[in-house]
Amino acid sequence: MAGQNKEGAENMKPYKILIIEDDPVIQGEMETLLRGNGYTAVSVKDFSKVTDTFKAEEPHLILLDIKLPNESGFSICSKIRSISNVPIVFVTSCNTDMDELNSIMLGGDAFITKPYNTAILLAKIAALLRRVYASEQSEILTWNDATLHLESSMI
């Protein structure tokens, strides 16, 4: 599956993605898309506790809207970036160059405008996860019943 690590995928949990989106229809669509592609999808329910939800869930990646209740996605990005390097993908109806520039300057890793192309969204998610977590995946190789730990050279 797209969301699982290649080596020993059957023994590893899929990547967890936190959705920070206040539109329930879009939130539901994202959850369905992600789960259908092998990811674990978790959505923020209480927008006054986004940072707490992030800390509790420990996601591998965040999908973040800009226009949210209580505070902007830009503010949330800054708060999360101050405590974590988790990849952040802005998925938003805000489509100006300034919006995209702000997202980059505040630590966002990708910027996708709504309505989004699901194939492009999934490709960006996969690319970010591969880049950020590649070293974790490559430390252990599994073939049939044999497991090689690269760091220690132990089988």
Per-range role (PLM):
Residues 15-16, 127-155:
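Short, Lys/Arg-enriched segments at the junction into DNA-binding effector domains
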Residues 2-132:
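N-terminal/domain-start alpha-helical segments
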